Amino acid sequence: MNDLNELKKYIQDVKDFPIKGIVFKDISPLLANGEIFRIVVEKMAEKVREVDVIIGPDARGFIFGAAVASYLKKPFVMIRKEGKLPHNTIKIDYKLEYGMGSLEIQKDLIKPGQSVAILDDVLATGGTTKASVELVKKLGAKVTKAVFLMELEFLNGKEKINAEVISLLKY
């Protein structure tokens, strides 16, 4: 696939979901097509070959992050909502559109000095990604890239992220 914009036909707009006034980008058709999903994994992998660790935020970041990490034979580390990870974790509180949220990561899975890439489905306001970057920084590592299937440019989330931002698709 030479033109990545062809991927857009596998992403459906769902009006008024999850609440009235929102147009949700449903990636289910893309994930349900093995060949198309493989193309996305390969394209994302091209962008992060040189990093040491790949992380993905709860929940759709797990899909892309784990697939790309496996493809590249690199470690994958989950970022989860508070209280969902065992063992020693560190936490960060961050602002959501409608309140506050908390994210956690396990302390021992990323080492100081490692380069890290965040992979996720969509870059919207940038709040989750910014918080994820801060969590990695607390561990002494550095997020060098944030790679997304799609970016909602009108929300300006890219401006909040202190790393190279790469989006396969832009809306």
Curated annotation (Swiss-Prot):
EC number of this enzyme: 2.4.2.7
Enzyme class: transferase
Pfam family name, one: Pribosyltran
Catalytic reaction annotation: AMP + diphosphate = 5-phospho-alpha-D-ribose 1-diphosphate + adenine
Keywords in alphabetical order: Cytoplasm, Glycosyltransferase, Purine salvage, Transferase
Location(s), subcellular: Cytoplasm
Gene3D superfamilies the UniProt entry points to: 3.40.50.2020
A single BP term in Gene Ontology: adenine salvage
Gene Ontology, cellular component aspect: cytoplasm
Functional pathway: Purine metabolism; AMP biosynthesis via salvage pathway; AMP from adenine: step 1/1
One term of GO molecular function: adenine binding
Family annotation (InterPro entries): Ade_phspho_trans, PRibTrfase_dom, PRTase-like, UPRTase/APRTase
Coiled-coil zones: none
PANTHER family for the chain: ADENINE PHOSPHORIBOSYLTRANSFERASE
Subunit text: Homodimer.
Functional note: Catalyzes a salvage reaction resulting in the formation of AMP, that is energically less costly than de novo synthesis.
Family: Belongs to the purine/pyrimidine phosphoribosyltransferase family.
Protein name according to UniProt: Adenine phosphoribosyltransferase
Species of provenance: Mycoplasma mobile (strain ATCC 43663 / 163K / NCTC 11711) (Mesomycoplasma mobile)
